[in-house]
Regions:
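Polybasic/polar functional segments that serve as interface/processing modules
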Residues: 1-61, 65-108
Length: 108
């Protein structure tokens, strides 16, 4: 089991609406070949969004703060074939962040 917590910074201030966040999170899930069960997203006013995709393997959530040019992400996966390093790379590339600081928390 692997748990990734991270913050994407720089170049992500454009994530002001829920549609862009939802599409990007879906791309991450599909690229990592994870299995979506359901999803919920919310648009904040005047800008910013939050979302969670419930996975058969666990969950993927993200919270945008366009005013700070940051997105916080949380990906938990119970698949034995899951690579935290690959997941972090996919997240950084799909969100097109200048920097992705992340931590891998091993779960038993």
């Amino acid at each position: 089991m692997a748990h990734i917590l991270g913050v994407l910074e720089g170049g992500v201030s454009g994530f002001k609406n829920v549609k862009e966040l939802e599409e990007t999170m879906e791309q991450v899930v599909n690229t990592l070949k994870l299995n979506e069960v359901s999803r919920a997203f919310h648009q904040f006013e005047p800008h910013g969004a939050t979302g969670v995709i419930v996975l058969a393997e666990s969950h993927f959530s993200a919270h945008t703060y366009p005013e700070d040019d940051r997105i916080y992400v949380d990906l938990f996966c119970c698949s034995k074939d899951f690579s935290p390093e690959r997941a972090a790379d996919v997240i950084a590339k799909q969100f097109k962040a200048e920097m992705f600081m992340w931590e891998h928390i091993k779960r038993s």
